[in-house]
Amino acid sequence: MFPATVQFWDTSLEPKQAVELALRRSARMQCERGHPKGRMVTLGVMSTPSPEFSALSAPLTRSRAHTRAGIRACVDRAIANGSLAAGLDAAALTCVFDSFMLGLSTLARDGKTFKAMDAAITQLMHLWDMHAR
């Protein structure tokens, strides 16, 4: 399991807090000195583009699916506990946060700072608030 995403499964955290914490930890890790720029789970798919290499990319695919499932679990928990609206499109909101998280690695690779990513995460979390009850 990717260390920055373990909080998705921590039910002692509020769902929004878990998602926000995962995003901020991932962004911070991407920008740490000595850490390769860009997340292997995201960018590793670029080195295995054809079907004959699918066995090589399978662990990366599973890791991304696990992260996506964690985000979805948080969204579903928030709907169940009433902190997000019941009619919310949970799949779409999950896709938004998953896409953003995957994009952090590209931003890091392109030299964006943690400060810039952190500010973007703050803006993204307003989307969660827009759907709060």
Language model: regions and residue ranges:
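Amphipathic alpha-helical segments used for helix-helix packing
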Residues: 33-55
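Structural signal for well-ordered, non-membrane alpha-helices
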Residues: 2, 6, 20, 27, ...
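Hydrophobic alpha-helical segments that form the core
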Residues: 37-43, 86-107, 120-127
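Amphipathic alpha-helical packing segments from all-alpha helical-bundle domains
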Residues: 17, 21, 36-37, 53-80, ...
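Amphipathic C-terminal alpha-helical segment
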Residues: 29-33, 77, 97-115, 127-133
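Residue-level recognition of alpha-helical structural elements
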Residues: 15, 37, 56, 86-90, ...
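Hydrophobic alpha-helical connector segments
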Residues: 5-38, 90-97
